[in-house]
Amino acid sequence: TYAAGPLTAQAYYHQFKRAVGTDAVSDKQMGLGAGYNFGMFRIAGSYNVADPDGANNKHTGYNLGVGVKLGAGELLGQVIQQKVSTGGTDPKATTFGIAYTQPLSKRTNVYATYGQTRNNSTGAFSLRASDITIAPVVAGDDPKAFSVGLRHMF
């Protein structure tokens, strides 16, 4: 992790073995991310790859997010693209999210969010809304979620 003033950057690489039956397989994960805070707005992006052992299962993802200050609150937006390389018709999805958060005090805020994952015909990527995962019923479904809430940090 690197942080200097308004600039942040991160990189990671993991390689680990997991036991499957009697054979140990090796999985790899890697990613890069960066962000910049311009004061009234901020932008961040990342690129991630997960390559589990075996053929035709490499997962890649791109993420771009923005935050814009609106008075004391903040409007947030995010776009994520995901793909699994299967050697056939690759499952793909684009997820869009928008949120607004408004502080009520130093430790309490209210928020509203909307998100949608758009899967291609073979995609079955889920949508995560807060701590809930909304999975598509069948490949090609497009899960959606809207939430409002009050958050207090202890």
Provide a role label for each language-model segment.
Residues T1-P103, T113-T117:
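Detector for outer-membrane/organellar transmembrane beta-barrel domains
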Residues D23, N57, T122-S130:
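Outer-membrane beta-barrel and related beta-rich outer-membrane complex signature
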Residues Q82, S130-I134:
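Extracytoplasmic loops and strand-loop junctions of Gram-negative outer membrane beta-barrel proteins
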Residues L104-V110, G140:
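Short loop/turn motifs that connect adjacent beta-strands in outer-membrane beta-barrel proteins
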Residues D141-F154:
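Outer-membrane beta-barrel "beta-signal"
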